[in-house]
């Protein structure tokens, strides 16, 4: 999965997919009542990027729905996965469940079209703080009470705080999550970060009793760091330059081993060689 980083304006969906992304990451900010409000990152952000592009969250979802609904004039067949980077740092811990419920209702109405031929992309809820695990249970409760528990089949999870892998496993246990787990590791492109924790996550993914299904690394903008991440065995790379990742995947060393994921590749299944 080539994951376009910080896609917060509707116009950027086309831009990143046309550069080779089959997945995008979008920032979600919340108001003081735990309503998802804007797709907005803010300053500071990655080096070389504009930090302040934004939409109202529900408007972004409508644009995203068009981009992922077959038959729509804005449809992109290859856009198959969306990571919502949930900026829950502005919330109190006890608001996490409410944030999950409100997020689910927004998605149900504006992205899934109340279950009637909505957008088809898989969705990853990426949460920065392990203490906010109730966002997951709230999300699930809301979809169930709205009569659409089947949409949970399209939803996966990520804790993005680079926490100890044992602590992450524990948070999932508390949230009642068994599967659909993406594990991120990374840092802003302005700084360097080694691959030690990525290798631990990959080892967990490939063990018989691990909790991780997929591992992605962020934010990778250079050819050599792309090669290093692929050599470590990641499933996804988040980038500001999807064309750079696509170029490296075309190199003979990687062409035989990796391919770009399509809609038929289940993002919740651990890949077995």
From Swiss-Prot:
Gene Ontology molecular function terms on file: lyase activity; metal ion binding; phosphoric diester hydrolase activity; toxin activity
Q: Which residues form a coiled coil?
A: none
**Required cofactors, per record?**
Mg(2+)
Source organism: Loxosceles apachea (Apache recluse spider)
Q: Which GO terms describe its biological process?
A: killing of cells of another organism; lipid catabolic process
Q: What is this protein's record name?
A: Dermonecrotic toxin LapSicTox-alphaIB1b2
Q: Which UniProt keywords apply?
A: Cytolysis, Dermonecrotic toxin, Disulfide bond, Glycoprotein, Hemolysis, Lipid degradation, Lipid metabolism, Lyase, Magnesium, Metal-binding, Secreted, Toxin
Q: List the disulfide bonds.
A: 45-51, 47-190
What is the documented function of this protein? Dermonecrotic toxins cleave the phosphodiester linkage between the phosphate and headgroup of certain phospholipids (sphingolipid and lysolipid substrates), forming an alcohol (often choline) and a cyclic phosphate. This toxin acts on sphingomyelin (SM). It may also act on ceramide phosphoethanolamine (CPE), lysophosphatidylcholine (LPC) and lysophosphatidylethanolamine (LPE), but not on lysophosphatidylserine (LPS), and lysophosphatidylglycerol (LPG). It acts by transphosphatidylation, releasing exclusively cyclic phosphate products as second products.
Please tell me which top-level EC class this enzyme sits in: lyase
Q: What is the lineage of its organism?
A: Eukaryota, Metazoa, Ecdysozoa, Arthropoda, Chelicerata
Question: Is Nucleotide-binding a UniProt keyword of this protein?
Answer: no
Tissue specificity is: Expressed by the venom gland.
**EC number assigned by the record:** 4.6.1.-
Q: Where is the active site?
A: 5, 41 (nucleophile)
């Amino acid at each position: 999965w080539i994951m376009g980083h910080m896609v917060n304006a509707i116009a950027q969906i086309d831009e990143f997919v046309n550069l080779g992304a089959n997945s995008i990451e979008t920032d979600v900010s919340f108001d003081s009542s735990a309503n998802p409000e804007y797709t907005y990152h803010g300053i500071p952000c990655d080096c070389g990027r504009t930090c302040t592009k934004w939409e109202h969250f529900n408007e972004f979802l409508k644009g995203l729905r068009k981009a992922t609904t077959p038959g729509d004039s804005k449809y992109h067949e290859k856009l198959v996965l969306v990571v919502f980077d949930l900026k829950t740092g502005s919330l109190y811990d006890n608001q996490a469940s409410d944030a999950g419920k409100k997020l689910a209702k927004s998605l149900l109405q504006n992205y899934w079209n109340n279950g009637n031929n909505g957008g088809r992309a898989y969705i990853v809820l990426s949460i920065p703080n392990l203490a906010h695990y109730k966002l997951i249970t709230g999300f699930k409760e809301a979809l169930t009470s709205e009569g659409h528990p089947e949409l949970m089949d399209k939803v996966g999870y990520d804790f993005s705080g680079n926490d100890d892998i044992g602590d992450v496993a524990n948070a999932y246990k508390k949230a009642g999550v068994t599967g659909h787990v993406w594990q991120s590791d990374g840092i802003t492109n302005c700084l360097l970060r080694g691959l030690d924790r990525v290798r631990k996550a990959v080892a967990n993914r490939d063990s018989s009793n691990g909790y991780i299904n997929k591992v992605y690394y962020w934010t990778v903008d250079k050819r050599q760091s792309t090669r290093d991440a692929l050599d470590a065995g990641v499933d996804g790379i988040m980038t500001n330059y999807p064309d750079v990742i696509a170029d490296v995947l075309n190199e003979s060393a990687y062409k035989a081993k990796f391919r770009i994921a399509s809609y038929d590749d289940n993002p919740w299944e651990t890949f077995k060689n």
